[in-house]
């Protein structure tokens, strides 16, 4: 079974042809969609469309626990997450790729843990993302001459609404990009000892910029971003070593009370 899982959108189908569809039942309900298993450049991977096959789940209703649990049940050890984000800084331009290294959680009412009792866990999130995977994707993006930022802080909001101008100006003080789907996905993966890397693609500037949003321009950028991510996945995934040496699973030794 696959050891690499991808959570993202329809753009993944550009490099991935499903060979098998697996329905996984979890203690947390059904995942966003049945898991599709196929290959990217000869490497077996599992794929879940985060928002559902027909984009039926808004960000605050994505079954995050079921998605991560289902991948783990299939034997997935590494998760590659793809997100579209808005920019909070001038230098993070539409069309750029950001390999996120930190996040700030401004969500409000999601299911954040697998451990609601009687077993209690306090997982370390000081460095939430797998250093081994981050290095591979950063180096590969540079090889492909893609516009990549090696670091970025992602502020995750509840959604589905966008920010007010006041909120956007506040978020600018401590984050680089803004989105709605990183949390609780990243902490759930950590609770199961899985490696997790986030590839965020910038679609436009958030409302702090006070620039009129051109819907056609946003769609054009999103299409280009899909193509960039496809190139990145095709080149990077074959570089991922069979055995993990990153220590992401070590958190399981210290997180239980």
Curated annotation (Swiss-Prot):
Residues involved in phosphate binding: 10, 50-51, 181
Site (Important for substrate specificity): 163, 215
One BP annotation, GO: purine ribonucleoside salvage
Database matches in Gene3D superfamilies: Nucleoside phosphorylase domain (3.40.50.1580)
Cellular component, GO annotation: cytosol
Coiled-coil features, chain-numbered ranges: none
EC number: 2.4.2.28
Record flagged with keyword Ribonucleoprotein: no
NCBIfam families in the cross-refs: MTAP, PRK08564.1, PRK09136.1
Oligomeric and partner information: Homohexamer. Dimer of a homotrimer.
Protein name, as recorded: S-methyl-5'-thioadenosine phosphorylase
Gene name tied to this protein: mtnP
